[in-house]
Amino acid sequence: MRRILQLTLASALILLPAWLSAQDAHHDHASGAHGGERQGVVHFPNSGARAAQQPFLHGVALLHNFEYDDARAAFRDAERADSGFAMAYWGEALTFAQLLWGLDYADSARATLAKLGPTKEQRLARAGSPRERLYGAAVEALFEASDLPTRTHAYSTGLRALTKAYPSDLEARALLAVSLLFDRSGTPAEEQARTEESIRLARSVLSAQPDHPGGAHYLIHAADNPRYAPRALAAARAYSRIAPDAEHALHMPSHIFVQVGAWDDVISSNERAWAASRAWVKSHGVAPTELSFHTLVWLQYGYLQQGRFPAARALIDTAHAVLAGIDWNTSDVIDARYAEEQLRFAYARESGDWNVYGGRVPALAARNARDSSDRTALFASVDAYQVAFVAALVGDTAQANTIAATFRPRAVVARDEIAALVARARGDTATWIAQLQGAAKDDETRVHGGPPFAFPPHELLGDALLAAGRPKEAIAAYEKSLELMPNRTNAKQGLARARRAAGVTAERPRSSSAPARS
């Protein structure tokens, strides 16, 4: 019974519009950056004054590392050193396009551009060279008054023109590589083609310049799913050495390590990144909401996969302690707002210890009405699912159904899984299994990136089939789950149980250092 109570959602990503995918959920971090001197090496010939060179180049490296706050400060230093240096303003504007994180501060970017000139034409006229004008045209396209898909497509188009005119420009090639990941339009085949191109571009940058931060970083992003992850293992092992002062660079390798189930490496990466995040917050004297709670969530996931449950549970207490006293009516840092409940749910889901909820249904986290970002929508959707799940678990099927009724139309997997939980609570085994079969089928069309906010549906289906005395079918479900998310401990243990129940002999799965659960 304890195992059955671990039923959860396969991926919170299904709760969002089509263009917001796994990378938005799992490539997000605290809003603060953590940029020291060692950020990798960039070569960017430009027209700026001598005094502007160091801050500008440092800003470009920080931008490649997604250390947005510190990159912005560096570009502003370059502007102060040379007020007519257009590239510094275009660089600063890009720090507001945190699009892989689901954050788009276009108004702030436009305010930055206005410092350079009141119109696009006047700003482009201040470019120091034809090459810089092409950079400017791409950035200007990203912040036109249009919808985001149109803007990101125009940005990629501008960067493609730049790389065609200047094929040896590694900075342009790197920016094009990551820009292709912003574009979620078109068919699955078209999206796959963009991913393949992004991988090729990033690898070519890294091959030409092994210490380039963008080459390693963007290759990890592009390859962040089980199909492509092996192609980025070398980059994952190199990135933290390329930019050891970037907290993001310490964390990012774990995106690949999770995809191949390398739990020791996941833990090592995120222990270092969490320590760097805490050091940055302390040294800058900023609020603890600026901590990288994304890193903390990934660290806990590594602990959970190795069965280190006391260490994993302690991180719930860590989040609670560092966020004590925060006024959530004024703070709009989304990762911090939802951190404790994310950690609590993940712990219960992986360990089977639902006592962390004390037998009560948690309240939906209060949302800050000022923040309407896609990232906020993602976290609110995840929170709603988790509350609905716990409600069904304790038998409050009415509340579970009420919350599920608010899910977006595209939230097929979420809706099916809540319906399955409700059916199980009512003793309807046939509907329980049928709903999970539907969820599992739909999930096979989705990209799986990073730790799940909840259980993959094939694991849920395997649990249900095993409980219903259908172990051979459960074997297939667990095997499919491991194909989609390699080396997950719960799937491996479920598979072993199903094989025993079916009388199937098989080689013992590799150990994940996790103890078996009853």
Protein language model features and the residues they cover:
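TPR repeat positional signature
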Residues: 55, 89, 96, 134, ...
